[in-house]
């Protein structure tokens, strides 16, 4: 049986992968996530997703290793995780009534056969008009300081949106399951057996 590894320390990504009911291990890779000068958002998420999976390749021979990474784009700028409540509030104030794009890179490497697949999924969030009070209450309650976009889709973040647009809502949480299943089938592992 093919052995599967998730290259992530994120409990949200593990919860998503659990939905496929496949046995897997997980480990948090340690890579430099700094964007390169003039690197496009697509190139960045491809590089980081593949880099996370590759970082674990030596520890997991004969495995399929999944890596993913996400960026938030607003006004043609890549926004990182807010890190503090003031930045999270400022981001959400900027997003009020606006469209924000998320790109999630996904990579699968097959260490047994020295091959890999890399892609990304796009997902757009259209925020409703938000009051300063709503933003303050949301940030105080959810503390989305380590989340791209300054919100958590898997929590109260859903209350901030007017609508969502994209192929796979799991993309917004950080692991596009539809594309992952396609990649796993290409690698010879059908989640349905």
From Swiss-Prot:
Pfam families: Maf (PF02545). Keywords: Cytoplasm, Hydrolase, Nucleotide metabolism. The active site is at 69 (proton acceptor). Its EC number is 3.6.1.-. Its cofactor is a divalent metal cation. Transmembrane segments: none annotated. One of its GO terms (molecular function) is nucleoside triphosphate diphosphatase activity. Signal peptide: none annotated. It catalyses: N(7)-methyl-GTP + H2O = N(7)-methyl-GMP + diphosphate + H(+). HAMAP family: Maf. Belongs to the Maf family. YceF subfamily. This is 7-methyl-GTP pyrophosphatase. It comes from Chromohalobacter salexigens (strain ATCC BAA-138 / DSM 3043 / CIP 106854 / NCIMB 13768 / 1H11). The lineage of its organism: Bacteria, Pseudomonadati, Pseudomonadota, Gammaproteobacteria, Oceanospirillales.
């Amino acid at each position: 049986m093919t052995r599967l590894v998730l290259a992530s320390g994120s409990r949200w990504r593990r919860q998503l992968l659990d939905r496929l009911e496949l046995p897997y291990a997980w480990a948090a890779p340690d890579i430099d996530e700094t964007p390169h000068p003039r690197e496009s958002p697509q190139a960045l998420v491809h590089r980081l997703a593949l880099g996370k999976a590759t970082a674990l390749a030596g520890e997991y021979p004969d495995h399929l290793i999944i890596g993913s990474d996400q960026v938030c784009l607003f006004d043609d700028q890549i926004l990182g995780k807010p890190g503090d409540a003031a930045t999270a509030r400022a981001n959400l104030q900027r997003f009020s009534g606006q469209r924000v794009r998320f790109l999630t890179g996904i990579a699968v490497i097959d260490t047994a056969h020295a091959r890999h697949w890399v892609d990304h999924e796009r997902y757009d969030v259209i925020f409703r008009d938000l009051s300063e009070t709503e933003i303050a209450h949301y940030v105080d309650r959810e503390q989305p300081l380590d989340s791209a976009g300054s919100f958590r889709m898997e929590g109260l973040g859903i209350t901030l949106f007017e609508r969502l647009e994209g192929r796979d809502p799991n993309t917004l949480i950080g692991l596009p399951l539809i594309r992952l299943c396609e990649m796993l089938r290409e690698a010879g592992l059908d989640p349905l057996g």
